[in-house]
Amino acid sequence: MDKKVTEVVEAFAQPIVEELNLELVDVEYVKEGQDWFLRVFIDSEKGVDIEECGAVSERLSEALDKEDPIPHLYFLDVSSPGAERPLKKEKDFQQAVGKQVAIKTYEPIDGEKMFEGKLLSYDGTTITLLLTIKTRKKEIQIPMDKVANARLAVTF
């Protein structure tokens, strides 16, 4: 059900976001406690401001209210994905090459399911990370079909 809702919302949101020269990063539909939340994440090369989030929220809310494709009452939240932006699309991974990323896998690779390191390359099927373990550096390859979650990682 949740996946279907996100796909429907993406279809509504994509033209609105494109019209405003923005990028649709992700859509989440989750239940927290008794409430449903529809979260729409937008971005652009220059980032997004509150006015852009408000414009998308207003237009998307009107479109969703008109068609009413979601069976529950929900809270709509349009925002930037933040510094730890999720990596979902091929373009996201390509743009993240050379940056710090955090990867979670469905099953262990070399005994681990969580990896954080520099994304060295992405070829569409495999991610190559450079991990720093204490003072040693280690390269690891992770097949995309094993990736459960990927995001940019902020390091201090």
From Swiss-Prot:
One of its GO terms (cellular component) is cytosol. Signal peptide: none annotated. SUPFAM superfamilies: YhbC-like, C-terminal domain (SSF74942), YhbC-like, N-terminal domain (SSF75420). InterPro entries: Ribosome_maturation_RimP, RimP_C, RimP_C_sf, RimP_N, RimP_N_sf. Its main location: cytoplasm. One of its GO terms (biological process) is translation. Keywords: Cytoplasm, Ribosome biogenesis. CDD domains: YlxS_C (cd01734). It is found in: Cytoplasm. HAMAP family: RimP. Required for maturation of 30S ribosomal subunits. This is Ribosome maturation factor RimP. It comes from Bacillus cereus (strain G9842). The lineage of its organism: Bacteria, Bacillati, Bacillota, Bacilli, Bacillales. The gene is rimP.
